[in-house]
């Protein structure tokens, strides 16, 4: 019975990790500003090594980051003939192609690549009205050109927290 459980576990882990051993040949990421494609040198299959000078994105844009195990195309969405299509008020699809032309043979391939991105960047927030500073905020007097953003306590003052002594370079007593 233990042998059957052991063999079942081996088969389970083999199947689970075999999916992770395969590497994606093309990965695409995008935003409202950038289109990034990462290509593995064994793009076509495991027998043909694709050199960086044999591939380009869209209308002739070469890879701009070349590493031993991948080539990366990083371009603005307005470059390289990247096409933009709004599919909803909130989502845009960017698309292009990876073109492969072998220097050693007449082989040529075109691989379509696309990516969806939100129209609004999650990093940008809606504008809001600024409130007048409250009484506890530092304000600059009308005739003064500088102000203190914060002040550090004097060394003789004890910190107002329950921090361990080593945080403030104090020795335990």
Swiss-Prot record:
It comes from the Eukaryota. The keyword Transferase does not apply. It holds the Pfam family ZP-N. Residues 1-23 form the signal peptide. It is found in: Secreted. Belongs to the PLAC1 family. This is Placenta-specific protein 1.
């Amino acid at each position: 019975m233990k042998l059957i459980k052991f063999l079942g576990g081996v088969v389970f882990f083999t199947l689970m990790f075999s999916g992770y051993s395969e590497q994606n040949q093309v990965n695409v990421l995008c935003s409202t500003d950038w289109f990034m494609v990462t290509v593995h040198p064994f793009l076509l299959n495991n027998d043909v090594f694709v050199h960086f000078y044999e591939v380009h994105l869209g209308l002739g844009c070469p890879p701009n980051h070349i590493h031993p195990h991948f080539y990366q195309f990083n371009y603005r969405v307005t470059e390289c003939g990247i096409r933009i299509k709004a599919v909803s008020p909130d989502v845009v699809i960017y698309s292009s192609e990876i073109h492969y032309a072998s220097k050693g043979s007449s082989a040529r391939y075109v691989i379509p690549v696309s990516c969806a991105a939100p129209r609004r960047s999650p990093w940008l927030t809606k504008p809001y009205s600024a409130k007048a500073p409250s009484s506890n905020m530092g304000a600059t007097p009308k005739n003064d050109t500088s102000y203190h953003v914060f002040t550090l306590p004097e060394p003789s003052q004890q910190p107002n927290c329950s921090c361990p002594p080593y945080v403030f370079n104090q020795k335990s007593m």
